[in-house]
Amino acid sequence: MPTKPRHIPRNFFLDQKSRYQKNGLTPLPHQIIHPFYTPTRAAELSACSKEVRGKLLEGLKVVPALVTDWKGKPLLRNRFIKFDTVKGVNVWLQGYASRRKEAEGVIYRTLEGQPEKLITPSKLHRSNVPLVDKVTELFGSERTKHLNSAALDSIVDELVNDREKNLFCEDVYIYLLQHHVNSEGKLIAIIESIKSHMEADIDQLKVAETLILQLVLSMQRNRLPVTKELVNAYHQLIDAVNQKFYTNACELQFDPLVTQCILEFHIMSGDLNHSKKLLSHLILNGWALREDLSVKYLQLVESKVRDEDIDTRTLKRFAYISDFRPLLQRAQTPLFFAALVPYCRHFGELYSLLTVITEKVHNTREVFDVTLLSMIEATTHMGKNNRYKSANLYELHRTVLPYYDNNLPAKFVKAFALQFAKFNNWSAIAGFFKQYPSYFTPNSIASLLSASQEGVTDSTNYPGGVVQMRKIFIWEYVLPLYSKMSLRARSSISATFDTPKLFTEAIKQELKLVSAGQADVMNELIAMGYESNLLRFIPATTWEDIFRVPHLVAALKPFSQEIESLSGKAAGATESSQ
């Protein structure tokens, strides 16, 4: 009996496999949907200079890509950019640069003008048509929630059938939409009436386009709430238009200015998928929409895509802004760039955004006024250790400084200093103190030391982060202002005096405050010194001053035995030296 021939599965990746990596995980240039990442010349040189395992973005899985599975089904995935060998890396980079430039040049027209001018004036006027009184009586002046559309249909039919008036149904609807829409119920009644007359009386797509445009404009002008009922009525009207004119997407066949108005309606209604469809259509046809509308769209993406996992959330959001690159090249609004900062997971992405702001934006400083704080916060999470994070933060500071004439506002300086403190980069903080001495109060300096204790520990040694630099910082900047700090501030930094020199000086400073009758943290300092074996470095004369204060003597009873022995040794050492 003949056997069924064995089917050998086709290797889908046989002719699709990336030439840049054997496992095919590195996406091809055309598969990447990142709207603003551009590798720097240094990053390109680094990738091309390694014989093996060259990479971009440190090889992290932060590159959004639309790839395909073995069946050819599209998959949205986070991918990394790694290359097995140096062979072909330059070809990949050239291909990506070509795709990037092509995307940036897609838009060559701007949607300008007033959409109201696209509407033909209605022939219906109150002065020459007495029947309009019936319409006024039907609609009334109140914000009626529900309205009988059948009664409206009869009035429309009566007006249209009067040959002396020479009116079309669109004249009636345009008049109603312009003068009698002050509630959701009235608008829904008009939509239902338009639907009922669609098959018999509306025979041109342009007429339907005009009615839909006036509907959207009236809703915006009267600031009507975009309710679920209103959205459903609108979609039913669109379905009726599609059915009448044998099309699947009449909104895409309208004038681009009309499509933009409809896009705004969908954004207001929270329909993200429909908004994405219209947005992509406009961009694909070379139209740049209003920038405030782009901002609203970005805000809609943020509000709708709320996955708990940050990588999944960011990936899905990238899918909705995949064609934003040409809009980014034209953007001037601070809120536009502020909405894009959370998309950055690697400093290479943030630096690409910085490059656009500094090279394309005319009001660069105004953009930084809005975005810089969020950029500082984002930078602190970019880098494999404190050394890289600190370097990225310094690069951000270096980039924005010229746009403030080398004089950053206080809120930005303090934000930079706080993050540098978390990375224990004391030389950078000292530089801020020298350049902006008036920005830092004694208590704020104490808060920087506290932040360094709460920051993530990192054993990586780098200039500015060594232990000795921290000691110098405390000696030169903290202790001279110690007496001006509040009790809470002094308490928060008591553990930082962990060397004999710093500890004894802090004890002396506290004694001066005690002598002045101020509240002190001497108990905390003594307890810390006891645990760190630093009490033996306190001079005998200082112990004598401490023992003259009754409340300090009472508080130091738990350490009395060791303190007495230490003070005795110190006194003996003093006498022998004399």
Swiss-Prot record:
One Pfam entry name: AEP1
Keywords carried by this UniProt record: Mitochondrion, Transit peptide, Translation regulation
GO cellular component: a single term: mitochondrion
UniProt cross-references to InterPro entries, sorted A to Z: Aep1 (IPR031467)
Span of chain positions assigned to the transit peptide in the UniProt entry: 1-15
Location in or out of the cell: Mitochondrion
A molecular function (GO) term: translation regulator activity
Function: Required for translation of the mitochondrial OLI1 transcript coding for the mitochondrial ATP synthase subunit 9.
Family under the similarity heading: Belongs to the AEP1 family.
Name the record gives this protein: ATPase expression protein 1, mitochondrial
Native source species: Zygosaccharomyces rouxii (strain ATCC 2623 / CBS 732 / NBRC 1130 / NCYC 568 / NRRL Y-229)
Gene encoding the protein: AEP1
